[in-house]
Curated annotation (Swiss-Prot):
One of its GO terms (molecular function) is protein kinase activator activity. Keywords: Autophagy, Coiled coil, Cytoplasm, Membrane. The gene is atg17. It comes from Penicillium rubens (strain ATCC 28089 / DSM 1075 / NRRL 1951 / Wisconsin 54-1255) (Penicillium chrysogenum). The keyword Endoplasmic reticulum does not apply. One of its GO terms (biological process) is autophagosome assembly. This is Autophagy-related protein 17.
Length: 554
């Protein structure tokens, strides 16, 4: 719109114009309609005030968004490292749990196997009855188990049970700790899902993009469109202010034209007495338009020539149709600003949501790292310490179980070998007795032959020989007596003796012909075992030797 012209200080009379000029100039009613339209157009000042508020609020939103981006980016970079460390710790704790559980399971299987072997051997000892010939006749029947003291086994079982219980307790505490750790991780994952949801929402609906691929990978957001949007808002606001100034100039020109028209002064004062709301307001961004309008209304009219008046009216005629277009443009611009401002606010709110989600994760991690994480790590270390201690005890107990099994299994094998030894000794005794019987028979023959020869000599020559020529000439043949000597102890202990025969001269013949008795009461007592027991013992010893040979070969 063209700028207004200065007016004369008094109403210019109509006689100053000729009839042609009077017909070409608009009537007062037309000028009043222009003034009313200009007055209505000043209502657009509320849009200008709103534009100024939007620009101010957008600057505040930008400042807050920059702070949020910076803080969120800083926290997010720290979170990435903390999360990696946290999952590394959880993985290590889980490895400790799995490793300990596997080792403990293997140890229990080995213990169960060793204990089963020991119990089987003890059952065999209970089921193996000592043959009565090994024991005194008045003694109650006994099994091999009666010769075993199981207190050592019971004490070993109690020790192993204590180690297993302590390990189970430590493992249960570790499992509980790990479950709590997992709950913490689930809570953190939930917080991270909130973060990712907020990020996706911002990325899909707003102009928030990642500054680079690495930034995208780390989830750090940066503002790309907000500064441009605010520049657009500022441009709209500036243009709206310019348009409003044009409307004000148009209004002032209408007031001046009406006042310079005959009879228009009172009408102008009447119309301008009730200005649209907001015209009298002011702030740092906008001047007090109401004061300027009032100053123009109350200012005295400057003298104006006919040419100046005609020029002013021509400007009004030209500008009046454009006033509505200016108002529409201001309306369009404020609508555009509201739309942009909604995007700015939404972007700020999205960043605020991301920031809150990040702070939530950070707070959770900080609380976890400062209070609960050390306890989870300590619990894993405690389990490792307990398991190392008890594993040594369990391994020692496993060795003791194996030793006891070997001892009792050796006892079983030794008893079988004892029966074989008894059979061997009895066979040797039988061979000895046979030698004795054969020798006795030969000695008896020699004795009889010698006695007969002596008797023949005595009968033939005895009458001729004096009795004192040889005292032994009339003696009977000597007798040979076998004496059984106890073998004593194999380690060289004292040896007892028990003669089998002490015959007198008159008993010799009978004793000599009686042979040698193999009674068990004489010399060494050898149990008389049934043949089937010896054969069964031999089969078992042979089977054990075969297994031992195979193991040695492997």
């Amino acid at each position: 719109m063209a700028s207004s012209q200065s007016s004369s200080s008094s109403i210019r009379p109509q006689a100053g114009l000729n009839e042609g000029d009077h017909q070409s100039l608009p009537q007062l009613d037309t000028l009043i309609s222009y003034l009313l339209g200009a007055k209505r157009s000043l209502s657009s000042i509320t849009h200008v005030w709103r534009a100024n508020e939007i620009v101010t609020a957008s600057h505040s939103a930008l400042e807050k968004s920059v702070v949020l981006c910076s803080r969120t980016g800083f926290l997010r970079r720290g979170l990435n490292g903390q999360l990696r460390l946290l999952y590394d710790v959880r993985s290590e704790v889980e490895q400790i749990s799995y490793r300990g559980r596997d080792e403990f399971s293997i140890a229990l299987k080995n213990l169960d196997a060793a204990d089963a072997r020991l119990k089987h051997t003890l059952d065999l000892l209970r089921g193996t009855i000592v043959h009565a010939s090994f024991r005194p006749g008045d003694e109650e029947q006994k099994s091999l188990h009666d010769f075993v003291d199981e207190r050592g086994v019971e004490e070993l079982h109690a020790s192993l049970k204590a180690s297993i219980d302590r390990t189970n307790t430590a493992r249960a505490e570790l499992d509980t700790s790990n479950h709590e750790f997992d709950d913490e991780l689930q809570a953190i994952k939930k917080s991270l899902r909130h973060y990712h949801t907020a990020t996706k929402l911002a990325s899909s609906r707003l102009s928030i993009t990642s500054s680079s691929s690495s930034a995208s990978d780390s989830g750090l957001l940066t503002l790309s469109s907000m500064p441009g949007q605010i520049q657009s808002l500022e441009a709209h606001a500036q243009e709206m202010a310019t348009l409003l100034e044009a409307l004000v100039r148009h209004f002032d020109l209408c007031v001046t034209a009406v006042k310079h028209t005959d009879g228009g002064g009172a009408v102008a004062r009447s119309i301008t007495g009730d200005m649209p709301a907001g015209v009298d307001g002011s702030n740092d961004g906008m001047p007090n338009i109401g004061a300027e309008i009032n100053a123009n209304l109350n200012a005295p009219l400057d003298p104006m020539t006919d040419a100046e008046y005609q020029e002013m009216v021509a400007v009004l005629i030209k500008d009046a149709p454009e006033a509505d277009d200016v108002v529409m443009e201001i309306q369009d611009r404020i609508n555009e600003m509201e739309s942009i401002f909604e995007q700015v606010q939404a972007q700020r709110d999205a960043l605020l949501s991301i920031s809150k989600a990040t702070i939530e994760v950070h707070s959770h991690l900080s609380s976890l790292a400062s209070s609960r994480l050390p306890r989870y790590i300590s619990q894993a270390h405690n389990f490792t310490r307990v398991w190392l201690e008890e594993n040594d005890r369990i391994n020692s107990g496993l060795v003791e179980l194996s030793d006891l099994h070997s001892l009792y299994d050796g006892f079983l094998n030794a008893y079988d070998s004892l029966m074989l030894e008894v059979a061997r000794r009895r066979h040797v005794r039988q061979r000895v007795e046979k030698v004795l019987r054969d020798t006795r028979h030969k000695l008896d023959q020699l004795h009889d032959e010698d006695a007969a020869a002596r008797e023949t000599f005595r009968a033939e020559q005895g009458d001729f020989l004096p009795s004192d020529i040889w005292p032994g000439v009339g003696l009977a043949p000597m007798q040979v007596q076998f004496t059984r000597l106890s073998g004593g102890q194999l380690d060289g202990g004292p040896i007892g003796q028990k003669p089998l025969e002490e015959p007198s001269g008159g008993e010799y013949a009978g004793a000599a012909k009686a042979g040698v008795s193999d009674g068990s009461a004489e010399g060494e007592q050898i149990p008389d075992l049934p043949r089937h027991l010896v054969e069964e013992a031999y089969a078992r010893v042979k089977a054990r030797n075969k297994v031992a040979s195979q193991l040695h070969t492997v």
